Amino acid sequence: MTVDLIPVARTPEGGWTGAFPEPVLAGCHAPLVDGAPDMRGVWQVTEVLVDGRPILEHPALGSIQRIEQCADRVTITAGGIIHDMRCDGTVEHGVNDVAEFDKQTPISVVATFEEHVHVLRPVGLPIEVKRWRDGDDLMWQYVGFTCRLVRLGPASMQPG
């Protein structure tokens, strides 16, 4: 199945709770596009850095993300949201969903792959969110902090 045949997933009203929703791209087996980091899997934050220094208490510590990929498409399921995007540099195919912090504020985010880095640029905000591989680990740079994540298993596994 191709990415074009799989409907775009959206965060349910109010966000999802409890068990992770079923994977979105499970039936898609197209190879990743050139320049895409392989982020597929279920990941857990094990370290948070602020200004290069480890922070021992942070809301992101221990959090879990499921990342699915197929061709230029990425879904990130975490914290009650499902962000489904094509990494083609357009608003139309980027994340058009709700923010994680309240599960109701609409967001539009342009997604790209740039030299093996997944880059998210929220429309109207001067920030970038990045994900890239560092050996076996995944790095996630958000506003004000950077996280190291370890892979718990394939994207098909049910976290928890």
Model-found features: residue ranges?
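N-terminal glycine/threonine-rich, aromatic-flanked beta-hairpin/loop signature
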Residues: 5, 54-104, 143
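Short, basic/low-complexity N-terminal boundary segments at the transition from targeting/disordered tails
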Residues: 39-54, 86-94, 99, 107-118
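Surface loops and adjacent helix of pleckstrin homology
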Residues: 48, 79-81, 88, 123-124, ...
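Short, exposed beta-strand-loop hairpins at the edges of beta-sheets
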Residues: 137-144
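Amphipathic/hydrophobic helical signal segments and adjacent flexible N-terminal regions
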Residues: 1-73, 154-160
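Beta-strand-connecting loop/turn residues
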Residues: 70-74, 116-118, 136-137
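Acidic, glycine-rich flexible loop segments
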Residues: 105-129, 133
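A structural detector for short beta-strand units
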Residues: 63-65, 81-83, 107-109, 126-130, ...
